[in-house]
């Protein structure tokens, strides 16, 4: 067997990149562990702001761990796919990292997808669980008999709002929501979280940087959209690269998270890059010129 050959790769572009290092050491753990390590350094910094309501890194980690315990309480196991059909809201951040913490895979999809598209995403990923908003429940219920879902968890935007804003929301947007039958086979977010508070068994999975953590979907411009498997290392490397090429960044800096969490830029940069480096995400659930 011949000895491994050494290759000299020319990198002329480095001369134009100033003080950007030619080599970076990437965080060797999971998505959650990267954020957890950062939170230890900045526990009282604001992790994200949603409709004026601030959440610290300390509080965010607590919410993620309770959510992870809730996922275990409903039977989510390492390697399971959990579909997340949410806009940029606190529940999306919480459940995304909780899924990673229990060793499952987050299948991120557009919450405004059609019923047919949702059915495709659920079947393509083999998802057994789904998390979405109450306003999208009827689309999931319409295709439920065609897929293999064990549980649908329904979150609500109002649950993430401060009291004054919640009152205004219920007078405007809240009135537009279709009623969900009381006997609907779903689990409301608040009840889901209560289960997490009551779960006291092991919930942290032993996963590493190279394990698949996320499924995002291609644009489908040349055919049927395809699921793209991404590891924790993919996101952690991106987070390190973005900061290395933006030396003006400082912990506490804010980013307007307009790009959605089912999009590579939105999830990888607006959310994970900021949260693994002490930044603050301004979560925008629906982009308009006014918002």
For every predicted segment, state its role.
Residues 68, 81, 87-107, 111-115, ...:
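A short helix-loop-beta submotif of the ANL/AMP-binding
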Residues 236-254, 262-291:
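Conserved AMP-binding/adenylation subdomain of ANL enzymes
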Residues 8-16, 33-56, 203:
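AMP-dependent adenylate-forming
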Residues 56-58, 204, 213-237:
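Conserved AMP-binding A3 loop
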Residues 43, 179-217, 224, 247-254:
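Conserved pre-ATP/AMP-binding loop-to-beta segment of ANL
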């Amino acid at each position: 067997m011949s000895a491994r050959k050494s290759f000299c790769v020319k990198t002329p572009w480095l001369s134009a990149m100033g003080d950007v290092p030619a080599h970076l050491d990437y965080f060797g753990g999971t998505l959650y562990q990267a954020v957890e390590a950062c939170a230890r350094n900045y526990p009282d910094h604001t992790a994200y702001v949603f409709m004026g309501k601030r959440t610290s890194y300390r509080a965010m980690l607590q919410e993620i761990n309770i959510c992870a315990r809730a996922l275990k309480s409903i039977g989510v196991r390492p390697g399971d796919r959990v579909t997340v059909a949410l806009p940029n809201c606190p529940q999306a951040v919480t459940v995304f990292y909780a899924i990673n913490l229990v060793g499952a895979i987050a299948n991120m999809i557009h919450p405004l997808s059609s019923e047919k598209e949702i059915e495709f995403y659920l079947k393509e990923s083999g998802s057994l669980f789904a998390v979405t908003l109450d306003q999208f429940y009827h689309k999931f219920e319409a295709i439920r008999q065609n897929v293999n879902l064990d549980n649908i968890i329904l979150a609500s935007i109002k649950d993430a709002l401060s009291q004054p804003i919640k009152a205004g929301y219920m007078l405007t947007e809240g009135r537009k929501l279709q009623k969900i039958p009381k006997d609907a086979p779903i689990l409301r977010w608040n009840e889901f979280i209560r289960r997490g508070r009551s779960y006291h068994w092991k919930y942290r999975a032993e996963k590493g940087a190279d394990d698949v953590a996320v499924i995002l979907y291609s644009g489908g411009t040349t055919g049927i959209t395809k699921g793209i498997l991404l590891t924790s290392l993919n996101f952690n490397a991106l987070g390190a690269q973005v900061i290395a090429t933006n030396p003006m960044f400082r912990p506490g800096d804010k980013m307007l998270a307009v790009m959605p969490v089912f999009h590579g830029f939105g999830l990888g940069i607006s959310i994970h890059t900021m949260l693994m480096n002490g930044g603050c995400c301004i979560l925008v659930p629906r982009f308009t010129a006014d918002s």
